[in-house]
Curated annotation (Swiss-Prot):
A Pfam family matched in the record: Kazal_1
Top-level taxonomic group: Eukaryota
Record-annotated Kazal-like domain positions: 6-56
InterPro entries named in the record: Bifunctional_prot_inhibitor, Kazal_dom, Kazal_dom_sf, Prot_inh_Kazal-m
Glycosylated residues, chain numbering: N45
Annotated organism of origin: Rollulus rouloul
One term under GO cellular component: extracellular region
Coiled-coil parts of chain: none
Identification of the protein by name: Ovomucoid
Record-marked site positions (Reactive bond 3): M18, E19
Principal location listed in the UniProt entry: secreted
One Gene Ontology molecular-function label: serine-type endopeptidase inhibitor activity
PANTHER family reported in the protein's UniProt record: OVOMUCOID-LIKE-RELATED (PTHR47729:SF1), SERINE PEPTIDASE INHIBITOR, KAZAL TYPE 2, TANDEM DUPLICATE 1-RELATED (PTHR47729)
Amino acid sequence: LAAVNVDCSGYPKPACTMESRPICGSDNTTYSNKCNFCNAVVESNGTLTLSYPGVC
């Protein structure tokens, strides 16, 4: 399995769309889309990573 990276430059954003493109984070939480995931990455000081695209 190749590591999948998400470019979170330009985050955090104050508001995310309701778009549903689930991402599973390394904390075993399903984020509804890249925006929500990237905001969480910034909040975690970069410790949160992407496990895989899709629901955990």
